[in-house]
């Protein structure tokens, strides 16, 4: 961590708040106990308004949550059986004052997850692999605007931005919604 005003180094830490090590952890094994260190690359670190820091441990398929001083708070695994590039690529928070929701881009499984931030419960996901609207080709980054719309970008050969319009909050019929196909007005 660096001081935002002065740019001075303050502190750093690894998984679970441990001192980081650069030891090669070998390949990720979803059946093994959770790695006690982050695997490379740690793909995002986002600070919520309440002061909690969310870290995307991409190849370990998990988000770890910390206090600003490095104290470990909790973790959640997302698509834990994802090998290779991992499932936790980027996150964004909803724009309500409490940042009630966390949105996660999973580039390996071509999905966006909507997660209840306080419990880290997955409420729903949408998307699938492909090049049509509503599909993803290595969804890499995610952001939200002041109106609650979600924006995604893709890497490798995806090379596009998609916008998903916020239409309100309602009941979700199933956990995985698949592709959200565009509808005519």
Language-model segment annotations:
Residues 1-185:
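Eukaryotic scaffold repeat domains enriched in small/polar residues
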């Amino acid at each position: 961590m660096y001081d935002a005003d002065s740019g001075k180094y303050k502190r750093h830490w690894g998984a679970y708040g441990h001192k980081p090590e650069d030891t090669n952890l070998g390949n990720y094994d979803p059946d093994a106990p959770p790695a006690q260190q982050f695997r490379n690359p740690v793909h995002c670190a986002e600070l919520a308004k309440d002061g909690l820091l969310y870290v995307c441990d991409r190849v370990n398929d998990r988000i770890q949550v910390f206090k600003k001083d490095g104290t470990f708070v909790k973790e959640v695994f997302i698509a834990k059986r994802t090998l290779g590039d991992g499932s936790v690529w980027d996150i964004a928070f909803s724009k309500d004052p409490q940042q009630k929701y966390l949105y996660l881009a999973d580039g390996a499984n071509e999905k966006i997850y909507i997660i209840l931030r306080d419990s880290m419960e997955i409420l729903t996901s949408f998307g699938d692999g492909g090049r049509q609207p509503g599909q993803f080709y290595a969804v890499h980054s995610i952001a939200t605007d002041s109106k609650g719309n979600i924006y995604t970008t893709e890497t490798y050969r995806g090379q596009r931005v998609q916008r998903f319009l916020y239409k309100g909050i309602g009941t979700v019929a199933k956990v995985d919604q698949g592709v959200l196909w565009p509808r005519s007005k």
